[in-house]
Amino acid sequence: MRLLLLVPFVVGCANKGNGGASATGSCQPQADNALRFDCDLPTDTDVIVTLEGPEGTLTRAGGPTLTLAGLRPGSTYAWSAAVDGAPIDSGSVTTGQLPELFDDLSFTVTGTDGPATIALPTMCNGQAVVTVVDATGSVVWYQPFDTTATDPTGGLSGFSITAAQTVLVHLDGSRIEEVAQSGATLFSVDGFESPLHHDLARGDDGRTYALFADLWDIDGQDVILDGVYVLDPDGDVVATWELVDHLGAVDVVDSGDKFWASTFPGAVDVSHANAIDPTPSGSAVMSLMLQDTVISVVLDPDDAAFGEVGWVLGPDGAPIVGDALTWLSGAFAGQHHAHVEADGDLWVFDNVGADGPAGERYAIDTDAGTAEQIASYPVDGACDHQGSVFVDDAGVLVTCPTPGRVDLFDADGAVTWSLGVTCGGGAGSGSLTFARAQPITF
């Protein structure tokens, strides 16, 4: 494993110049990004920067060297910096035009009162980029990434926003990177023994949790089963969890899913994990799509119970050894983005459930051994791959990538705002792929 801590270095590709960005005063445009400005302010303490622009008043906080980000393209902002309310500097910045990759990648909005800013990881015509858009659909931040693999495991295959509002990704199934809003690379690790896939997340403990896959033999058949790498803040793998250690009797049935066809030819994918979410308790929830099952696992390496499966939520006969929960209502199938919110409720994007695709909320009672659906946010049309559901200040944000759509639901379950995502006019699998849209703040 290798850890790189490269604060001034900005990663990227297909990002030629800064689109004509300009500035006055102590802030200067980044050479290779149209929407970011690096400031070196005349103070040695923390500052508040106020910007006046087309969307009104914005504020940014940081040390004397900070980056202004989250700005619309082709726009001028007057800025002023203050320490404890006393002005120390002022100037203006004018953002440039977006790079060529946005000639194909575009966003359209219907409705009003959308989320302030959301981040989307996209592969558009082979270009990996994380883009942040505001409630009007305007791009306000972007970060391209270099990728080379062309099979389903390649490109930008895992994504999450950390509690520190940084961007965490894994690329080409082989490396993990964390990028600050300034564009600086904070974390870069490669050299994994097994291929990464689908999802990764940063826990409150500062550790990074990443899904991987391994090849196993079950009764003479090559079988693909999932695991989790646990990395410490230095990028070292400090623990590994393997699903194979927690399986009962399993029927090896070829689902026809070809995600791993080029990596593990001839093998049968049994579990197909697609979500990992560490919780403050030291456990994590994991979605196993091909088992229509979500499980809770102790993944804190400092816990004597590390590796133990707690509850198991899925159909009768699910082969994972753990405490099976009883459905009081609801059920899901082919699910994605299983995670636990602060109130302890489980949220899942249900791709092919009985009531069609929907973001769903479940109350989990481990004492009673039950799961009860308490909310559902259905989307129109098919969602046969990926998908997510997030709780945002503006409402419940549900992503259905197949048609390239993100919907915002209000407290009454009505869609009040939608974002359409297209790549050269196309959506869904093919020219455009993206897994989720996640709230982010600047």
Model-predicted segments: where are they?
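Pro/Thr/Ser/Gly-rich low-complexity, intrinsically disordered linker/stalk tracts
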Residues: 21-43, 94-100
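Short S/T/G- and acidic-enriched coil/turn segments that sit immediately N-terminal to beta-strands
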Residues: 63-67
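Residue-level recognition of well-ordered beta-strand positions that form the cores
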Residues: 38-40, 50, 82
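Histidine-/acidic-rich catalytic cores in large beta-rich domains
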Residues: 41, 76, 83-442
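Extracellular low-complexity, O-glycosylation-prone stalks/linkers
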Residues: 46-58
